[in-house]
Regions:
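Active-site-proximal helix-loop-helix substrate-binding element of RNase H-like nuclease domains
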Residues: 1-51
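Catalytic nucleotidyl-transfer cores of nucleotide-processing enzymes
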Residues: 7, 111-230, 322-335, 339, ...
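Generic non-transmembrane alpha-helical segments
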Residues: 19, 253-264, 290-302
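Common nucleic-acid-contacting/processivity interface regions adjacent to the catalytic cores
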Residues: 33-142, 146-149, 208-252, 256-260, ...
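Catalytic palm active-site di-aspartate
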Residues: 193, 265-279
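Hydrophobic, well-ordered secondary-structure elements that form the walls
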Residues: 193, 223, 254, 274, ...
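Catalytic palm subdomain of template-directed nucleic-acid polymerases
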Residues: 276-293
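C-terminal, non-catalytic extensions of nucleic-acid polymerases
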Residues: 289-536
Length: 536
């Protein structure tokens, strides 16, 4: 359930409200023995309701069905799939293939990674801060599996005199001389997935379509599992050269595409391991889609498929790696924002924080600067006045165990877990603990556990939450010259159309205008920190 939903609160009551819109029966676990003596039927009803909710959640989310799909692909029992890690999926297929090919299988072992053992990761083409228009996103289909197949990368083909030379220096035998186990397995999985997807298109039965869709998704998960385990430091077949070779080929691919596009005057505003974001020279839907399809066909070669995944209009980033937000307008128009890397996606952010950030992004994409400022100021004012429900301020974090940290007495999740146990609730190491900060001025800060369905009778530290909101919002609005102090004062008058800020969009003059340094365009206003008292 944690893998599927990543909910901010993991109690049965909280997940039931999130998924089913229903809650547990109101029985205090601390007085369960008394309830059993006085009202046995109610306790029985309570237990039946708990079991019913848990089963319905599993069926609604599809956890069991997804486990069965992965079990089918990996040839494992469902129980093993649901409780094991990804290396078990890879092991099941790879050990079978090794046994049938007469290849020895190492005993599993664990080794602590050393700093100099870490392989270089994928390439990231940093995005400069700004608002971009008509952004084409091209994404490699199954990039790592395709690279492994194309270059015959495997522990069985790694040799000093191989014909295939990785950018990292490792050499592999050509498939004509020796076909690797890993490329053979991945080729079979890729063909299996293509066959399933063809059957999906052919069927008119919704139930069969749903089943096949789950199956092809499971094949994709298993395919991508192999790079992960070979790039790790614990897998039985791990060799540093293999993981390094895969990422080296990936970096070469992506940087080559970026160089080609930019030499032709097509600005690439962002790129990562397997995708590139290009500013379209056409400023309309039809023209941008045509350009995107052309580039997709052009760079799909040598067994690699570069798909035209989506078109965004507009897209915003404040310049941090892997953090952006945009509106998808193709292949289908989406009402929801696509958000990557910001607090909206983090399970330890509180709901009001996520909600305000989502609304703030919407106004930024609409170039509504006055609305953005008003939103932040009004939200902070409401928090300081205590006009927000406690459940909007809940912070959650996983707790490994009560003695799993060096300074447990300073950890908010430990403090909340202990108080939760005092209230009669069970604690299981690894579970997510939820709390509300009641006094941030102390060291450590004081927190109280929040239990879904149980009234919260303490007073939150509203000043603490207001400060967090201003700090979070300022990281976004500083792109436009609005600092944390400006947000608290509400006095900054910059707009998206002032000379201090030029949205990074393609113009008729040509791409060279887009490429001007953002540092020359954005002047961040410096000011002293302003207290919340001064704000009011």
């Amino acid at each position: 359930m944690k893998k599927e939903l990543r909910p901010k609160q993991e109690t049965l009551n909280a997940v039931s409200k999130l998924i089913l819109g229903e809650e547990k029966l109101d029985v205090d676990p601390k007085h369960m023995d008394d309830e059993w003596k006085n009202n046995r039927a109610r306790v029985i009803e309570y237990c039946i309701q708990d079991a019913n909710l848990a089963l319905r959640i599993l069926l609604t989310v599809g956890t069991i069905r997804k486990g069965m799909d992965l079990a089918t692909v990996s040839k494992l029992p469902v129980e093993d799939v649901l409780v094991s890690g990804t290396s078990t999926l890879a092991d099941s297929l790879l050990i079978r293939a090794a046994d049938r090919s007469g290849v020895g299988v190492p005993m599993s072992g664990k080794r602590k990674a050393q700093r100099d053992d870490q392989i270089a990761g994928g390439y990231v083409h940093t995005m400069k801060p700004g608002l971009y228009h008509w952004v084409i996103v091209l994404d490699f289909k199954s990039m790592y599996p395709s690279l492994i197949i194309a270059n015959n990368i495997c522990f069985t083909t790694l040799c000093e005199d191989g014909d295939i030379v990785s950018p990292s220096g490792a050499r592999y035998a050509s498939p004509e001389k020796k076909r690797g186990l890993l490329p053979t397995i991945l080729s079979g999985l890729m063909a299996q997935r293509d066959s399933i997807k063809r059957n999906m298109k052919a069927t008119e039965d919704p139930a069969e379509h749903s089943y096949l869709d789950g199956l092809q998704a499971a094949v994709k998960i298993v395919m991508n599992t192999f790079y992960g385990v070979f790039a790790s430091d614990f897998y039985r077949f791990t060799d540093k050269s293999i993981g390094a070779s895969i990422t080296a080929f990936a970096r070469k691919n992506i940087t080559g595409i970026i160089d080609s596009l930019e030499k032709e005057g097509h600005p690439v505003i962002y790129g990562d391991t397997d995708s590139v974001f290009i500013l379209s020279p056409k400023h309309d839907l039809e023209g941008a889609v045509e350009f995107g399809k052309t580039q997709s066909e052009r760079f799909s070669k040598n067994g690699m498929t570069l798909e035209f995944e989506k078109l965004m209009e507009p897209l915003f980033s404040h310049g941090m790696k892997k953090r952006y937000v945009g509106r998808i307008v193709w292949p289908e128009k989406h009402d929801d924002l696509l958000v990557r890397g910001y607090e909206i996606r983090r399970s330890d952010s509180f709901d009001l924080q996520s909600r305000m950030l989502t609304e703030l992004f919407g106004k930024i994409l609409d170039e509504d600067n006055e609305g953005a400022l008003a939103l932040v100021k009004d939200t902070i004012r409401d928090v300081m006045a205590g006009k927000v429900p406690p459940e909007d301020l809940v912070i959650s974090r996983t707790c490994k165990g009560l003695d799993a940290y060096e300074n447990p007495e300073r950890m908010a999740n430990i403090q909340a877990a202990k108080k939760m146990m005092d209230m009669g609730y069970n604690f299981i190491p690894g579970m997510k603990i939820s709390w509300i900060v009641t006094d941030a001025s102390t060291a450590p800060q004081e927190v109280e556990p929040f239990i879904s369905g149980v009234p919260f009778n303490k007073k939150p530290d509203y000043r603490y939450y207001a400060g967090r909101l201003a700090q979070m919002a300022s990281r976004i609005t500083e792109v436009f010259g609005w600092t944390e102090a400006d947000l608290l004062l509400g006095s900054q008058q910059k707009t998206l159309f002032d000379d201090d800020f030029i949205p990074l969009r393609p113009k008729k003059e040509g791409p060279e205008d887009v490429k001007k340094s953002t540092d020359e365009k954005i002047q961040k206003k410096k000011s002293k920190t302003v207290s919340l008292d001064q704000f009011f």
